[in-house]
Amino acid sequence: MLNIKTKKKNKKRIYVFNKNPEFKFKHLVFQKNKFILKIINEIDKIDLMRSEIFNSTLPIDPQTGNILVRFRKLNRNRLLAIKAIIQAMLYHFNIKTKKVTASVEQLADECGLSTVSKSGNKSITRASRLISQFMEPMGFIKCKKIKTTNNKFSKEIILTPLFFMILVKNSSLSEGDTHLKQEFKILKNKNVHINSSETFAKQEILKKIINKYSLNKLKKLGPKKIKEKINTEYKNIKK
């Protein structure tokens, strides 16, 4: 009797199916705001990993308002994915309403973050988790559930001032030519209020609070008391 030895193949589990997600838009002229187009084109020059806002902002659970103790930070794969998502959100951004005019599924498709199984089932989990478990708790976006015509729920995405702050603070975009500066002023006037001095000052105060207290103490304080401390400290500075 022959002893046939079978070699077991070491199959590595694939955690990320597309390691290099990239935003690919269909219509070149959809977004006409020159300032936003410049951000889209120069997203690779923005160093999000070293961002003071990224490193000092406390993630807040949008449902409960509590600080998220266990929170997944950016790694290389998530960084590439978030840059692609940022580009897509900006591309579909309506300045008047502050809303993204694309669904999560559309954003996932355009960024290469959606997958289709062998059975034909589509998954947009990677994009939806990035939006609901990272961008929203960090305060970069706000999500609202809306009822669609087929009685299902979809997410309405609103870009916050912090979303733009992180992009402008970590790039040379604010040092651009006069025309782009004018575009940025127009963008601010159209209900996207970005008070850079106040926001930056409050982020610095927040950073000091984080360094001063332990994680358990911060959790006990809660977002409301932390916000009160920040506002009190900011008023004292302005006196």
UniProtKB/Swiss-Prot annotation:
- UniProt cross-references to InterPro entries, sorted A to Z: Plasmid_replication_init_RepA
Family designation: Belongs to the IncFII RepA family.
Stored Pfam families = IncFII_repA
Choose any GO biological process term that the UniProt entry carries and state it.
Answer: plasmid maintenance
Q: Which UniProt keywords apply?
A: DNA replication, Plasmid, Plasmid copy control
**Record's function text:** This protein is essential for plasmid replication; it is involved in copy control functions.
Identify this protein by name. Probable replication-associated protein repA2
This chain's source organism reads Buchnera aphidicola subsp. Baizongia pistaciae (strain Bp)
